[in-house]
């Protein structure tokens, strides 16, 4: 029986974990044609490559010195915590990967805490030591202090450290002495990470993740915790609430390099993919046919945010997307629920809408962006934070926020966060930059990142993670400026936009199709202003001077999806289609809007 090591990689967004896995595959000669080896093999989802983040956990295996190493790539962002907890169930050890300059970030802390609670022993990899002004020795001390504060055992605190640069393709035990490859890391994994415990008995496998194939349907992925599974064997699927179903395994596959290989039998401790099970959910157990014993199901953190999803009912409905009806939207959300553990969906206030609950703005915006690329047209409302009643008191989610920024912007950043009910916990200098830590309500984070980046000229590095629930902190003032709302449907005209420049900043360029009720800019004052930017210049038979037709407009403000979701007010929606993104009022007609607001005020 082949020796196995199961290891998960923990790292913050963009600290280089996917690059490191690529190097491990390269080293183990798994990529057949090395010259054609692309970068970031693991981030196979367009969104993941663009944003430089890993959203879905993926499995890869490499064979080194005759030992099979199953590497599980975890998402680094706490918004995808649902993925993280499942993945750690499959691993026996973890690689903690940190940036030699940035050190441990809040998201790393979130996943590390989960790993320590589960008793996993880490191997610390300090990456990017080729960067200027890196501080590997200080970072190692920081990681030790962090693990101590998270309640790690003595054995866990006695961790091994490997330094290197995944991008340049080397790892060594001393960062001042670069090596030629990453064998130092692979050897350390074999020494430190324990082999999986082999438990004899009837088979048991906990389904930890799910893959989908257009040919065979849903595939269950998990680790065999006891006994062995064989292709064609009859099993019992143990679901929640003591429900049991008799099922047959059609095919068994193990992870081989980047792909999968069919096998007849999978032994205890290996990670495999099972084809042929129907109606399973993540957290179910594949058990013995005659004497089924269920494993405890996976616990996942609760959602902290909700958002209204509804069909696109704007005047431009159906022009750009393929899937535009509420039936399409419902089917897509139900499909997402099968593999996205931290998501919940409930019916909305009317038949065409749904309330979707998730872990944060990033979690939900990734779903919206994926749907947009698949050809969906939809509209989404302002994100709302979910409160809880604990001991008869209204409580709200509190996040731990860290900001790294140049010294000259510290005062401005502290003022912006405290205005949103944030409390400064820690402040320390790191060279020419300052590290700030705050506790802040989740709702205070909406729109904060874009404002901080503007105030610090793009220099701030912002990260946050859920800390827990605390009593409600009071009202937070939201965006103070009103919107510039279009009165007409038609093409935007430079002539009329030029005349309205002093009233605010625009989100669109001249010559763009707009409709009545679309938010086309931000007003300089508090209330909304209805404007007509479709008005053209009246032609006369008088000859105009040459300077008259030269209009100078500043470039429009362009939002990313997250920024748009954080920017909109309660009476606004974001319209998302495959080709464009627009902000609009829920009620498009100006007279109806006024009537509604006067009824509300009465």
Model feature map: region roles:
Residues 1-98, 102, 142, 210-213:
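P-loop NTPase switch module centered on the Walker A-proximal segment
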Residues 8-9, 125-133, 168, 174-178, ...:
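Conserved short loop/turn motifs at secondary-structure junctions
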Residues 33, 105-106, 131-137, 169-174, ...:
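Switch/connector loops and helix/strand junctions flanking conserved nucleotide-binding motifs
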Residues 67, 90-93, 118-122, 156-159:
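Short glycine-/polar-rich loops that comprise or flank the Walker A/P-loop
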Residues 79-84, 102-109, 133-137:
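Conserved ATPase-coupling elements of RecA-like P-loop NTPase cores
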Residues 103-119, 140-143:
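Amphipathic helical hotspot of TIR/SEFIR-family domains
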Residues 140, 160, 180, 184-191, ...:
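Accessory interaction regions appended to the cores of large information-processing enzymes
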């Amino acid at each position: 029986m082949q020796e196995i090591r199961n290891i998960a990689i923990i790292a913050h967004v963009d600290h280089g974990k996917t690059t490191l896995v690529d190097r491990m595959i390269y080293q183990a000669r798994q990529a057949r044609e090395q010259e054609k080896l692309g970068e970031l093999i693991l981030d196979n989802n367009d969104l993941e490559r663009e944003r430089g983040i890993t959203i879905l956990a993926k499995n890869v295996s490499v064979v080194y010195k005759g030992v099979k190493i199953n590497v599980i790539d975890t998402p680094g962002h706490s918004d995808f915590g649902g993925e993280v907890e499942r993945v750690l169930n499959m691993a026996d050890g973890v690689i903690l990967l940190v940036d030699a300059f940035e050190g441990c970030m809040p998201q790393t802390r979130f996943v590390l805490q989960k790993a320590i609670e589960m008793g996993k022993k880490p191997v610390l990899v300090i990456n990017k030591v080729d960067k200027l002004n890196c501080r590997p020795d200080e970072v190692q001390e920081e990681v030790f202090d962090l693990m101590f504060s998270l309640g790690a055992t003595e054995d866990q605190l006695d961790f091994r450290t490997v330094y290197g640069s995944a991008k340049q393709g080397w790892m060594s035990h001393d960062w001042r002495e670069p090596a030629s490859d990453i064998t130092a890391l692979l050897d350390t994994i074999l020494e430190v990470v324990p082999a999986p415990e082999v438990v004899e008995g009837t088979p048991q496998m906990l389904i930890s993740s799910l893959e989908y194939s257009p040919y065979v349907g849903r595939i269950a992925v998990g680790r065999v915790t006891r006994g062995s599974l064989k292709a064609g064997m009859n099993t019992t699927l143990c679901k929640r609430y003591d429900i049991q179903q008799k099922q047959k395994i059609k095919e068994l596959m193990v992870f081989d390099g980047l792909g999968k290989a069919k096998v007849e039998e999978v032994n205890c401790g290996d990670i495999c993919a099972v084809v042929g099970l129907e109606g399973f959910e993540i957290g179910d157990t594949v058990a013995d046919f005659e004497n089924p014993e269920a494993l405890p199901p996976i616990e996942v953190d609760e959602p902290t945010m909700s958002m209204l999803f509804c069909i696109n009912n704007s005047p431009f409905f159906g022009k750009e997307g393929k899937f535009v009806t509420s039936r399409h939207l419902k089917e897509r959300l139900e499909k997402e629920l099968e593999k996205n553990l931290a998501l919940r969906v409930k019916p909305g206030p009317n038949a065409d809408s749904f309330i979707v609950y998730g872990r944060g703005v990033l979690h939900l915006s990734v779903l919206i962006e994926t749907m947009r690329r698949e050809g969906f047209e939809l509209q989404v409302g302002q994100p709302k934070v979910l409160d809880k009643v604990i001991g008869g008191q209204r409580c709200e989610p509190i996040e731990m926020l860290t900001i790294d920024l140049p010294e000259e912007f510290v005062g401005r950043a502290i003022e912006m966060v405290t205005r949103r009910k944030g409390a400064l916990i820690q402040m320390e200098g790191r060279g020419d930059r300052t590290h700030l830590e705050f506790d802040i309500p989740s709702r205070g984070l909406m729109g904060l990142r874009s404002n901080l980046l503007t105030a610090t000229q793009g220099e701030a590095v912002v990260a946050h993670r859920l800390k827990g629930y605390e009593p409600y902190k009071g009202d937070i003032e939201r965006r103070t400026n009103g919107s510039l709302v279009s009165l007409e449907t038609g093409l935007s005209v430079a002539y009329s936009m030029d005349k309205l420049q002093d009233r605010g900043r625009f989100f669109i360029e001249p010559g763009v199709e707009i409709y009545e009720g679309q938010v086309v800019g931000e007003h300089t004052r508090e209330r909304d202003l209805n404007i007509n930017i479709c008005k053209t210049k009246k032609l006369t038979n008088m000859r105009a001077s040459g300077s008259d037709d030269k209009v100078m407009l500043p470039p429009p403000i362009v939002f990313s999806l997250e920024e748009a979701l954080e920017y909109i007010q309660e009476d606004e929606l974001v319209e998302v289609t495959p080709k464009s993104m627009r902000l609009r009022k829920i009620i498009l007609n100006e007279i109806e809007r006024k009537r509604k607001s006067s009824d509300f005020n009465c």
